[in-house]
Amino acid sequence: MTPTHFTISSAFLLGMMGLAFHRTHLLSALLCLEAMMLALFIALSLWSLQLDATGCSTAPMLMLAFSACEASAGLALLVATARTHGTDHMQALNLLQC
């Protein structure tokens, strides 16, 4: 395993572990999701550069656009949750408590 592959895999796994273990605030979950998407974006960009294929060069930009849409939807949910519940704790999002 090359150092580049190790770094990208480590970044993705750290984001996944953060998402699994630190689920108290919605903002921290969104940041962990963004870290995972950034690791995937870098991996896909390096993969398309390694192959020298022009057809694969649009995939990282498409994934970056989807990541930006995911971030904006997540922040909109964060604002809506903070306005209705007064907090961004994940326990406030339980449907049985609403």
Swiss-Prot record:
GO terms for biological process: ATP synthesis coupled electron transport. It is found in: Mitochondrion membrane. GO terms for molecular function: NADH dehydrogenase (ubiquinone) activity. Signal peptide: none annotated. It is a multi-pass membrane protein. This is NADH-ubiquinone oxidoreductase chain 4L. Keywords: Electron transport, Membrane, Mitochondrion, NAD, Respiratory chain, Translocase, Transmembrane, Transmembrane helix, Transport, Ubiquinone. Core subunit of the mitochondrial membrane respiratory chain NADH dehydrogenase (Complex I) which catalyzes electron transfer from NADH through the respiratory chain, using ubiquinone as an electron acceptor. Part of the enzyme membrane arm which is embedded in the lipid bilayer and involved in proton translocation. It holds the Pfam family Oxidored_q2.
